[in-house]
């Protein structure tokens, strides 16, 4: 599938992809900058990422690694990766012939946004209801 179709679909969806270099486009969603990688060697490979969205320190290094692992287990298709002291998110997909690009791109962007949100909330110590549910804390019995 030609990347011109993907770029056109992003424009139809209201995004404004900007060419960064020969194989890279950037576009904005909410407060995020997303990158679309054009793999000239493989037209069927689609990759959208949120690069270097979090920088961690030695103090929170283990928490960061644990949170990356948790999000990777929780959100399908998105991979959080660590490069040096930065966390990035990527969604990679192999395109088929009759792909519904609007549905696919919406799913990819939503999954990336969700991963980022869950990661940041967990790093700030917030509880995620569906993730941090503890049945022992859900005691309906009251002492009268």
Region annotations inferred by a language model:
Residues 18-20, 37-41, 83:
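Short beta-strand micro-motifs enriched in acidic
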Residues 24-25, 43-46, 87:
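Hydrophobic residues embedded in beta-strands of well-ordered beta-sheets
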Residues 30-60:
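Long, continuous compositionally biased terminal/linker segments
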Residues 51-90, 144:
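Short, internal acidic amphipathic alpha-helical interface segments
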Residues 65-75, 101-127:
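Ampiphathic alpha-helical segments that act as solvent-exposed interaction surfaces
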Residues 79-115:
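A mid-sequence interfacial segment
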Residues 124-144:
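Short, highly charged C-terminal tails/helix-capping segments
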